[in-house]
């Protein structure tokens, strides 16, 4: 199996694994808890997306990554982390704008994923990623599943509870 196939297989298994965890434990918990508390829980992991800045650090990567991938991925993750922090703060403060901030963060963060995955597959090879290889195989599946859960909550539960 070539290295790109290994990467894609790893990401797929990660998404399936986090999906199983979501179905068995997270979704039942979300249904049993207040809407804003659930959104806060799902938003917290995204605050740590600043780790994507490591795509810009040679030494963490085996060689400098193609800037057509590294730059938008790194700064897209930083923006997503800041937006997640704003949304989380609004949720914890029970701001009347908290759901709006969650929508903004979730749309921007999900769009960043689409761009980063597309650019990553196009311009970066797994062997160049060095230690950052663990971002797409561990963090991305968790964050992808949590984005989907946030969209699910915003679309289905928000109508019932606000």
Which ranges hold each PLM region?
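Small-residue-rich transmembrane alpha-helices that serve as helix-helix interface/gating elements
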Residues: 10-14, 131-147
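Membrane-interface helix-boundary motifs at transmembrane edges
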Residues: 26-39, 92-100, 158-162
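Juxtamembrane "helix-exit" motif on the non-cytosolic side of transmembrane helices
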Residues: 24-28, 55-64, 118-126
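A generic, lipid-embedded transmembrane alpha helix
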Residues: 44-59
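Hydrophobic alpha-helical membrane segments
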Residues: 76, 80-84, 101-121, 140-143
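Non-cytosolic membrane-interface motifs at loop->transmembrane helix junctions
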Residues: 64-75, 101, 126-138
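Hydrophobic transmembrane alpha-helical segments in integral membrane proteins
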Residues: 1-18
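Alpha-helical transmembrane segments in multipass membrane proteins, preferentially the mid-helix core
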Residues: 79-94, 149-153
